[in-house]
């Protein structure tokens, strides 16, 4: 039996991320009524942006299309903007059924993440102004969740951050009906903080975030496997290996993705590389054995399968089943 993604903790991490972001929602078009008030806030009340060093003093992502949101539809609008930027040609109306929940009158964060994955994009969450400015300066727009109301009367809203200017202490966003809206950093800090400084990157799988961490990137790419976006997940794992060439999880994920793309030669090589990285782990030997058997390399498959059984571990029963299946093939 082929052990699909026998990688400890990755599936758990995906579920945890979705649980964490699944409990909030936005509440529609109040942003339009508040926009005049927001842009009028004092620029001198914060050094929010200037506190971040080692970044350009100003940056702007110029190629993000703008879609004016319809009532209660800021989730589909924001997601459509960044998906189009990433190369996926969709309108907000194409996404509404995927991300908008009528009963909640808004879009959950987990729905945006799931939709991005279904369209072959890596959904990578960030938090904090340092990460936000790093991504903008790298040319990556960021969806942000802000609360335009109060803690006791929240008015959730999604916008897309496009730029910043440290000297002027300003943040530039596509929001509501306003393209390139300018907010003071003090205003942005307060409304974003109420949304727990949550940001979302929607990236092509060959493009790492500026602030990419290995575990977080691999968890995000595993989300593509979860929705069977095999070409995208294969690219995402290969991209990880360009930076973290000794990542066991990336080699295993690459092997799984390539196997599902019916590229047995490349899948076998990926699992072989994983065996070199963790020679005392039965999982890569089990998967390698399965692919070798499909390639008709039965003796090599038996050797690899037996090695997995000998190593044992929590998937020992699966390893035994793989070995028995290969033995039956060799006697047919």
Task: Describe each PLM feature range.
Residues 42-47, 166-254:
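Noncatalytic regulatory segments and standalone regulatory/sensor domains
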Residues 42-126, 131, 204-207, 223, ...:
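Cysteine-nucleophile protease catalytic domains, especially the papain-like/related folds used
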Residues 122, 126-174:
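Active-site-adjacent substructure of cysteine-protease-like catalytic cores
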Residues 214, 248-249, 282-283, 316-317:
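Helix-start (N-cap) detector for alpha-helical repeat units in TPR-like alpha-solenoids
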Residues 224, 251-258, 270, 284-292, ...:
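TPR/Sel1-like alpha-solenoid repeat signature
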Residues 243, 277, 311-312:
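Structural marker of alpha-solenoid helical repeat scaffolds
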């Amino acid at each position: 039996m082929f052990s699909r993604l026998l990688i400890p903790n990755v599936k758990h991490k995906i579920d945890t991320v979705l649980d964490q972001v699944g409990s909030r929602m936005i509440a529609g078009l109040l942003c339009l009524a508040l926009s005049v008030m927001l842009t009028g806030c004092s620029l001198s009340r914060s050094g929010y942006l200037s506190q971040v060093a080692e970044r350009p003093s100003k940056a702007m992502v110029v190629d993000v299309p703008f879609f004016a949101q319809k009532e209660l539809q800021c989730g589909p609008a924001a997601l459509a903007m960044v998906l189009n930027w990433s190369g996926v040609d969709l309108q907000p109306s194409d996404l509404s059924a995927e991300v908008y929940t009528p009963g909640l009158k808004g879009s959950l964060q987990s729905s945006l993440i799931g939709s991005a994955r279904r369209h072959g994009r890596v959904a990578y969450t960030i938090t904090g102004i340092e990460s936000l400015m790093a991504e903008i300066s790298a040319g990556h727009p960021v969806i942000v969740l802000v609360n335009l109301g109060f803690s006791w009367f929240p008015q959730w809203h999604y916008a897309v951050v496009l730029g910043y200017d440290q000297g002027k202490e300003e943040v530039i966003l596509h929001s509501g009906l306003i393209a390139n809206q300018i907010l003071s950093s003090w205003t942005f800090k307060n409304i974003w903080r109420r949304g727990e400084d949550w940001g979302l990157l929607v990236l092509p799988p060959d493009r790492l975030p500026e602030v990419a961490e290995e575990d977080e990137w691999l968890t995000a790419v595993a989300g593509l496997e979860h929705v069977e976006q095999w070409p995208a997940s294969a690219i995402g794992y290969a991209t990880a290996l360009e930076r973290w060439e000794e990542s066991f999880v990336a080699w295993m994920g690459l092997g799984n993705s390539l196997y599902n793309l019916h590229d047995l030669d490349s899948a076998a090589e990926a699992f072989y590389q994983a065996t070199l990285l963790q020679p005392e782990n039965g999982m890569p030997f089990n998967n390698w054995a399965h692919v070798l058997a499909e390639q008709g390399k039965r003796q090599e498959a038996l050797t690899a399968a037996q090695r997995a059984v000998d190593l044992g571990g929590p998937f020992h029963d699966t390893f035994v089943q793989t070995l028995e299946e290969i033995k039956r093939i060799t006697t047919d």
